[in-house]
């Protein structure tokens, strides 16, 4: 049930990608837990990239989760679905790393790959 582990890990990435954001906020003097979004709007450089990567992780998760659920319902146990889920997780980890390291072109390519993986998972009923 590796596909479920990928879904769980993708959900955990919603929290993991917040860690560098919180670190960047802390570096400004203190983490403002009363109004963290206002503090986040002030981030620049690494902090701004970390925030953008975190926000995109939140945006990418629902499409991936829907794709996994569609594939599990329509093609239970299909090896291609599991392979695609693993690829998604690896691509998103690479995307996150590229965003933090400011490697824009590769980051964009990885974003596109992750998006295509999610769409492919959702489209599986069309050929399975």
Where on the chain are the PLM-derived regions?
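Structural signature of hydrophobic alpha-helical transmembrane segments
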Residues: 78-88
């Amino acid at each position: 049930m590796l596909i479920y582990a990928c879904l769980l890990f993708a959900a955990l990435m919603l929290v993991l990608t917040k860690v560098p954001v919180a670190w960047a906020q802390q570096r400004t003097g203190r983490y403002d837990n009363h109004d963290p979004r206002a503090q986040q709007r002030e981030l620049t450089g690494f902090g701004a990239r970390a925030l953008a990567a975190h926000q995109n992780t939140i945006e990418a998760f629902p499409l991936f989760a829907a794709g996994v659920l569609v594939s599990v319902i329509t093609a239970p146990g299909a090896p291609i679905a599991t392979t695609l889920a693993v690829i998604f997780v690896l691509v998103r980890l690479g995307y996150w790393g590229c965003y933090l390291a400011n490697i824009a072109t590769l980051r964009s390519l990885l974003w596109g790959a992750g998006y295509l993986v999610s769409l492919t998972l959702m489209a599986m009923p069309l050929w399975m």
